[in-house]
Amino acid sequence: MSMTTSSSQLHTQPATTDDAPRIFALYCAAPRYFELLSAPLPTLPEVERELEAAAQDPKRCTELLCEDGQTVGYLDYKLDYPEPGDATVNLLLIPEALQSHGYGRRSIGLLEASLRGRATRVLASVYGSNVRAKRFWYSLGYHFAIDARPVLEWYAKEL
């Protein structure tokens, strides 16, 4: 599901296993995210396996966020999860050098617009104690919805 708007060059394109090196580079450009989770940076073969698994799940969408020929992020979300009519953002990853430039906000705006009429609620999963991510989702009108701490918190917004 590719999303574009006339006011922006930001768009998405479906990610495939061929895009694993690009996604791996995005992961490498966001080391603080993995430090926050106390998780090792995924290897390229792990990224490839994750994309293969996503391709087998008809409800899961993996997309590259692109602008002016540059990959500026990665979005992984699942439709009709956890309930029918929900869409859950599992990962919105923007390289550290590009954070706070509006890419995340614009990406979620495009996602929400594309889901209207197909989903009634968008959820965002926030792993660990990621205060910055929580502030980001609150700033977009999301509210605390599901407590699965210490591992995960979910934030939600009705469409």
Q: Language-model features: where?
A:
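Short secondary-structure boundary/hinge segments and terminal tails
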Residues: 45, 116, 132-133, 155
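Conserved active-site alpha-helix within GNAT-family acetyltransferase domains
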Residues: 105, 128-146
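Acetyl-CoA-dependent GNAT
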Residues: 5-10, 14-20, 24-99, 108-114, ...
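Conserved beta-strand-loop-alpha-helix junction that forms the acyl-donor binding cleft
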Residues: 99, 123-134, 150-152
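Short aromatic/hydrophobic contact patches that present stacked aromatics
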Residues: 91-93, 123-125, 156
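Glycine-rich phosphate-binding loop
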Residues: 102
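Terminal substrate-recognition subdomain of acyl/acetyltransferases
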Residues: 2, 153-159
